[in-house]
Amino acid sequence: MSPQTETKAGVGFKAGVKDYRLTYYTPDYETKDTDILAAFRMTPQPGVPPEEAGAAVAAESSTGTWTTVWTDGLTSLDRYKGRCYDIEPVAGEENQYIAYVAYPLDLFEEGSVTNMFTSIVGNVFGFKALRALRLEDLRIPPAYSKTFQGPPHGIQVERDKLNKYGRPLLGCTIKPKLGLSAKNYGRAVYECLRGGLDFTKDDENVNSQPFMRWRDRFLFVAEAIFKSQAETGEIKGHYLNATAGTCEEMMKRAHFARELGMPIVMHDYLTGGFTANTTLARYCRDNGLLLHIHRAMHAVIDRQRNHGIHFRVLAKALRMSGGDHIHSGTVVGKLEGEREVTLGFVDLLRDDYIEKDRSRGIYFTQDWVSMPGVLPVASGGIHVWHMSALTEIFGDDSVLQFGGGTLGHPWGNAPGAVANRVALEACVQARNEGRDLAREGNDIIREASKWSPELAAACEVWKEIKFVFETIDTL
């Protein structure tokens, strides 16, 4: 053994196990502008003090392990360790606490959501001393966000590409989601776009199955887009799902979409993974493609109040990794989403600077330092009677996506698209005239239906359809 090794191993080192809080609970710590800050909702096991639990979270998601190791003496733990700097009880909940943890920037690889999540939401979520753990929010410092490209294009560039301003964009997911041949699929796309929609969409689980291989779908969809554009004089698009079993195959599909002259492709970013998503986003930036993001699998991660990752964190991660649209829930449709919580992460997707606002679940002020914004996509169980509420809730910078609410029209796909476009134009005009969409929404739709038989038929079909269930994930 060399003298140097003897010194490191023998002086100032004491083997054994010590409380995490002795090293990682630092209530006097003043956070730095360059720190990544995290807010964890934690439920300690009975008998575990909250300070020890919070320190364990900081340790196990940064430099710590279960026992003292002599190699701690070979580095500066004070420089690299995470610190639990504050703990507060959760009002109305027994044995739940918000633990605030600060991470030094040196812990993370530049431009890698994958690496950031591997540390912050890695093994610590299986730690036995905790009954449950949920990451509620992250503060991404400008010094770190500037290492990411972010969305391929952003909201303003997309509007300029489409030449569409002053209203939400309209979309439709083609149904049935599985089983159509490529030609019949293309026909449905054409009918919806011709009827007045801006976009149609592959469902998230449409990849390249035996009933419809991806190349055939891309070709028939391209024909539908060019035909509908020629007939309407508007720029149209279809979210061609490039998600695949390998990154190489994903990129091949995106490249083919670009060769066809398509304006937008799609990716399932959680099932596909952040590494694949960032790779595709960079390709889209370099090649002029918009990128639509679906959040399939998110509810497995974010729906439970006491364990997992809140969607506001997944939304921030997507903005960093890259995407021009992302599904965000509807507030009024069939999918989970409380209004204030939803509007909180919608602002985190679209705006450049978002103030801390605990009433909407925003734990930290977030400055994106001019990173392009992401359009929220409201989709899931919505129809023409929801149009006024959706316009009022989400505003112009959004995509309102009606699948069954288009294709379920009694007269067919094109009339379903007409009904949605008429309803949207009526709501936008009424809002611009100063009318209150929240109070007068149904009256506005009824007035418009008097001169649109397509809208009148849609109103009759869906007049009794509501999805009234208690929200699980509330503030």
Swiss-Prot record:
Residue positions where N-acetylproline is found in the record: P3
Keywords of the record: Acetylation, Calvin cycle, Carbon dioxide fixation, Chloroplast, Disulfide bond, Lyase, Magnesium, Metal-binding, Methylation, Monooxygenase, Oxidoreductase, Photorespiration, Photosynthesis, Plastid
Residues with N6-carboxylysine modification: K201
Active site, per annotation: K175, H294
EC number: 4.1.1.39
Main location: plastid
CC per GO annotation: chloroplast
InterPro entries: RuBisCO, RuBisCo_large_chain_AS, RuBisCO_lsu_C, RuBisCO_lsu_C_sf, RuBisCO_lsu_fd_N, RuBisCO_lsu_N_sf, RuBisCO_lsuI
Compartmental location: Plastid, Chloroplast
Swiss-Prot/TrEMBL site (Transition state stabilizer) positions: K334
Pfam families membership: RuBisCO_large (PF00016), RuBisCO_large_N (PF02788)
Major enzyme class: lyase
Cofactor(s) this protein requires: Mg(2+)
Quaternary structure (record): Heterohexadecamer of 8 large chains and 8 small chains; disulfide-linked. The disulfide link is formed within the large subunit homodimers.
Cited HAMAP family: RuBisCO_L_type1
Name of the protein in its database record: Ribulose bisphosphate carboxylase large chain
Organism per entry: Anthoceros angustus
